[in-house]
Design a protein with these regions (language model features):
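Short amphipathic alpha-helix adjacent to the substrate-entry channel of hydrolases
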Residues: 98-116
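N-terminal cap/lid segment of alpha/beta-hydrolase-fold proteins
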Residues: 32-79
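Short N-terminal helix/helix-N-cap motif within the alpha/beta-hydrolase-1
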Residues: 94-98, 124-125
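N-terminal Sec-pathway targeting helices
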Residues: 1-16
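Short beta-to-alpha linker loops that shape the active-site pocket of alpha/beta-hydrolase fold enzymes
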Residues: 90, 118-122
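Primarily recognizes the serine-hydrolase "nucleophile elbow" in alpha/beta-hydrolase
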Residues: 139-188
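Short beta-strand element of the alpha/beta-hydrolase
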Residues: 78-90
């Protein structure tokens, strides 16, 4: 094989490799941009029977420390309703409370107040940060209970996926003093 033909083949291979790398980089960048765009866009509940208070900060020291409160639109000021504290899923590294609001608004229509809690995500914030934040959110609601039609004698705590694990561990700590002590939590 002569030298010119060899260099033509090598140049062609290099062009193909560079093209594949550039195409992959552009595709990856486009996918990341789309993912970030979807995360920024608000999920609307579009439910006229539900009043929504969004992005209430319950802790000023950690990111993601906001909660949404949903209640029936027609509740009168003297009524107290059962409250559901909810944490979203996402494998501890993704997700946002807003994505569950449409489903949770259907529960609200049945006569509940829902407190939908966001938390700081891994890997930047390690366990047990979400548990600490969930406790902070509950304490925030306890301190502000007179502002909302909440009956703290009727409480449901739940979540989906990672949120289900976190909330069930939180409940276990509330009912098991040795676990609570091992985790370094105080019952407030």
């Amino acid at each position: 094989m002569n030298t010119q033909k060899k260099w033509t083949i090598i140049t062609g291979v290099i062009i193909v490799i560079v093209s594949v790398v550039v195409a992959w980089g552009l595709y990856h960048h486009q996918q990341e941009s789309e993912k970030k765009k979807q995360q920024r866009e608000k999920v609307q509940i579009n439910n006229p029977n539900v009043k929504l208070f969004q992005n209430i900060t319950y802790n000023n020291h950690l990111p993601g420390s906001q909660l949404d409160i949903m209640m029936p639109d027609d509740v009168d000021k003297d009524t107290k309703l059962p409250v559901i504290f909810w944490m979203h899923g996402g494998g501890y590294v993704a997700g946002d409370k807003q994505y569950k609001n449409p489903l949770l608004s259907q529960i609200v229509e049945q006569g509940y107040v829902v407190v939908n809690v966001n938390y700081a995500l891994a890997p930047n914030y390690k366990y047990p940060t979400p548990l600490i934040q969930f406790d902070d959110a509950i304490q925030f609601i306890k301190h502000n209970k007179d502002r909302f039609p909440i009956d703290l004698d009727q409480v449901v705590i739940g979540g989906d996926s990672a949120g289900a694990q976190l909330t069930s561990q939180y409940v276990a700590m509330q009912t098991n003093s040795s676990l609570r002590s091992e985790m370094g939590f105080e019952q407030r």
